[in-house]
Design a protein with these regions (language model features):
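PAPS-dependent sulfotransferase catalytic domain
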Residues: 25-29, 33, 48-61, 74, 77-169, 185
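Short, well-ordered alpha-helical microsegments
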Residues: 13-14, 73-77, 99, 175-179
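PAPS-dependent sulfotransferase catalytic core
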Residues: 1-62
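Gly/lys/ser-thr-rich phosphate-binding loops in alpha/beta enzymes
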Residues: 55-90
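The conserved 3'-phosphoadenosine-5'-phosphosulfate
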Residues: 33-42, 89-99, 116-117, 153-215
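Short His-Asn-centered micro-motif
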Residues: 5-7, 31-32, 68-71, 92-93, ...
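Short active-site oxyanion
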Residues: 1-4, 63-66, 87, 164-168
Length: 217
């Protein structure tokens, strides 16, 4: 494991995922992996519902060179102890901008909740994200001021907890250079992958999950 992402979702984690896969030449773990891979979903669902008391992080992330996005970022302190050589990247974003993106995501997710009754796998995603993210992180409250406070407090905690020689505070608008410096890698010739995961992309991902949900595991 070379990189652990400690930044919340909606801070450019899809762009970071693509960039790290290019620089490290391997797979980078993201929420999308959980949604599309039954074994990953099963592990997180059982963990969230208390069916397993402890997550086997090494087994969960076997085959990945980096991990980013929620719910990974919630457990960065525990995970960084398992992988002491890994660098920690805190993706940051203006708080107001983050809130707008997060709020749009929650609105899109709520509109798709009806599908949860039809697709068992989608229901499992809703159950584990509600427990781990909505309840455990945000205390079941999604008001703007409260969510921004939680977001900013998380970032401050990362800055205090992670040793400076392991931490990169990173805005994806900075492009390749900070990542390449951290990883001691040459700057790629191709443009940095600025991926905008908007409503269309989310609906496409939900659609793919629904299709997978109707397939036999």
């Amino acid at each position: 494991m070379e990189v652990i992402g400690a930044g919340f979702g909606r801070t450019g984690t899809s762009s970071l995922q693509a960039a790290l896969e290019e620089l490290l030449g391997g797979k980078c773990y993201h929420m999308k992996d959980i949604m599309m891979r039954p074994a990953q979903l099963k592990a997180w669902h059982e963990f969230a519902l208390g069916k397993t008391s402890k997550m086997d992080w090494e087994r969960l992330f076997a085959g990945y060179v980096a991990i980013v996005d929620c719910p990974v970022c919630i457990y960065y302190k525990e995970i960084m102890g398992i992988f002491p050589e890994a660098k920690i990247i805190l993706t940051v974003r203006d708080s107001q901008s983050w809130w707008k993106s997060f709020n749009r995501l929650m609105s899109t997710v709520n509109k798709a909740r009806l599908l949860c009754f039809l697709v068992p796998k989608l229901r499992k995603i809703a159950e584990f994200t509600d427990k781990i993210i909505i309840q455990d992180v945000f205390g079941g409250r999604l008001e703007k001021e409260h969510c921004i406070r939680i977001f900013e407090r998380h970032n401050e905690t990362v800055r205090k907890v992670v040793p400076k020689d392991r931490l990169l505070e990173y805005d994806v608008r900075q492009g390749w250079e900070p990542l390449c410096k951290l990883l001691e890698a040459p700057i790629p010739k191709q443009p940095f992958p600025h991926l905008n995961v908007g409503k269309r992309s989310l609906y496409k991902l939900f659609g793919q999950t629904v299709i997978h949900g109707f397939k036999r595991p």
